Amino acid sequence: MNPDLLDHTVAEIAAEMAQRPDRGAVASYIPELAGVDPQRFGLVVIDADGHVAAGGDADMPFSIQSISKVFTLTLALGLAGDRVWRRVGREPSGSAFNSIVQLERERGIPRNPFINAGAIAVTDLILSGHQPREALGEILRFMQFLAGDDSIVIDDAVAASEQRTGFRNAALANYMKSFGVLDNPVEYTLGVYFHHCAIAMSCRQLALAGRFLAHNGRNPSTGHNVVSTQRARRINALMLTCGHYDGSGEFAYRVGLPGKSGVGGGVLAVAPGKASIAVWSPGLDAAGNSHLGRIALEALTRRLGWSIFGV
């Protein structure tokens, strides 16, 4: 990739997004997120050679929220392998990310690891055999290792805010517990879940952490394999089909990349073999995904010809 072209494209898109009046609405159901400035926008692209193109608020930390689910799934697969799929499916949900009705209909087995119920089940698997603090420490250290940055932390205020208001997540967890899907005390599993969703990262840190998914499971920064090639491809497949809740089809249609969103306004996207991409714009669309984040990524893939479906 020509680094000058990449720098120019990222700067151009960041400037365009700064001028757009349609910014979506910040997540209001988590009090700590409700006060985030909707004018913020950051974009970072790290290509296969390690060149970093950054625009806007690229180094401002934000709450990654559900983007953490990509990394907890990666950890859980490393710990338990295919046993993960006894607890959670691999199909798009077609429902809201916190739907209770679907969970009831399917006897406590979540559709995929990226909706809330699925991520809670994955968190429970990581927690097994550990104290909550140990499990959470393992998740945080994994994120720091991938990004090569020990300054990444959990925003305790956001975690506390989610714990105070996370009644629907508690309902999901208790429902799964009633079907034997969860092994650990619900309050322990939820505590770890709320805290890993409250990890704060910048676009630069997030793009660094996601590089292994763009390079067949290998972290180019260290040269070490994080996961196998097959596992990286399968995680990317789930990101493409399930990474944006019931907006996943629209994201695939418009952007054409595997991606995972969070209600903090972040999106981690993967251009296989080409780049790891992180974008942040706090305003959300009706499906709970970053409004300008999707528009920016669509512009990026169109201008660079990076859609996995061809130019």
Curated annotation (Swiss-Prot):
EC number: 3.5.1.2
Keyword terms: Hydrolase
GO biological process, one term: glutamate biosynthetic process
Recorded GO MF terms: glutaminase activity
InterPro entries: Beta-lactam/transpept-like, Glutaminase
Matching Pfam families: Glutaminase
Binding sites annotated in the UniProt record for substrate: 66, 116, 162, 169, 193, 245, 263
Top-tier EC class: hydrolase
Catalyzed reactions per annotation: L-glutamine + H2O = L-glutamate + NH4(+)
Similarity section: Belongs to the glutaminase family.
Quaternary structure and interacting proteins, as annotated: Homotetramer.
Record's protein name: Glutaminase
